[in-house]
UniProtKB/Swiss-Prot annotation:
Lineage: Eukaryota, Fungi, Dikarya, Ascomycota, Saccharomycotina
GO biological process: ERAD pathway
InterPro entries in the record: LCL2
Function: Probable component of the endoplasmic reticulum-associated degradation (ERAD) pathway.
Keywords: Signal
Signal peptide (UniProt feature, chain positions): 1-19
Signal recorded as keyword: yes
Protein name as catalogued: Long chronological lifespan protein 2
Gene, per the UniProt record: LCL2
Origin superkingdom: Eukaryota
Family classification: Belongs to the LCL2 family.
Amino acid sequence: MNCACRVIAVCLLLVQVSGFLFNFNQDPPTPPQPYEDKFLNSGCEGYLCPDTLECVSHVKECPCPFPKSQLKCTLPNNQYICISKPATHDEKLNAIYDDPAKGPKAKNKGIRDCGWVLEAYKDQV
């Protein structure tokens, strides 16, 4: 095999190898189903929560998107808002905020919890 054939063979091999190495897994990802399609095609007979797309009976039953790290504070108009659980090193307070019944009712001075949210809602902050 002469020198020119070897050069051509090496070049062809390099083209194939580079095509494999640099184009590997380059197929475009399939786009996620748009939010609007999920919302409109949910088949929910009750209320469809906008944040989580959970189907519930009433708006006040909607869960927070991240329940392990959020408190669901119910407002006087029966709407709700999800806030981050207060960061504290007090184990008793952490236990209260982790309790799904006690956490949303907690009102501790100096801590931005659901009690603080209600005061802010009533323009008392």
